[in-house]
């Protein structure tokens, strides 16, 4: 009794759907591999699950090259059946360069993880010692850079301190010169203020005495007896007898 025909529709049961996907996917990948080997065909298979997971198979060494060939066949000029030697050489060189870059990238990724302390299990003793030396060298360089940076900051602060001290010194000198300048322009200013009243009083007295001093006259203008003149001179000038020497002598009054 033969199998009945299976109706093609979406399987509603989630578990059955996943089991069916795994079986059909493995069978499809196996058929693609058999087709490429038996018929010497270039086969490329790309499968995405409902969760977005990728499954692929390519009979050639590069899936990208197969996709580029597919794109050229559909959207570009027809590719010649037999490629030239130059094209094969360029393609081989590009592929080798890609493999070298990929290997270098993987090595750098491993080194970075090892420096972060990850994936250290597969490393041998020598590799661990080399990693330790690299870390020590990196720490020394970092400490040297930090020390140099701190020294540079210290030198800058010291330079600023010297500049501020010089500025402060200059301002102090200017302030001291500002206080001394009025004294240099009038050093006896206090004496003038102190003796101002006394000087005015003395000047008034001198002018008063000068007003009542006797006038010096020629001998021919003097009149009266000599004795009376001498008596008036000995008595000294005053407000009452200042003009006695000038008055005419009256003999009748004696």
Curated annotation (Swiss-Prot):
Pfam family, one: K-box
Keywords assigned: DNA-binding, Nucleus, Transcription, Transcription regulation
GO biological process, one term: positive regulation of transcription by RNA polymerase II
Residue ranges crossing the lipid bilayer per the database entry: none
Domain K-box as annotated: residue spans: 91-181
Protein's cellular compartments: Nucleus
SUPFAM superfamilies: SRF-like
InterPro entries, per the entry: MADS-box/MEF2_TF (IPR050142), MEF2-like_N (IPR033896), TF_Kbox (IPR002487), TF_MADSbox (IPR002100), TF_MADSbox_sf (IPR036879)
GO molecular function, one term: DNA-binding transcription factor activity
Keyword Transcription regulation: yes
Major site of localization recorded for this protein: nucleus
Span of domain MADS-box: 3-57
Entry GO CC: nucleus
Keyword NAD in record: no
PANTHER family for the chain: SERUM RESPONSE FACTOR HOMOLOG (PTHR48019)
Function: Probable transcription factor active in inflorescence development and floral organogenesis.
Protein name (Swiss-Prot/TrEMBL): Agamous-like MADS-box protein AGL9 homolog
Source organism per UniProt: Sinapis alba
Name of encoding gene: AGL9
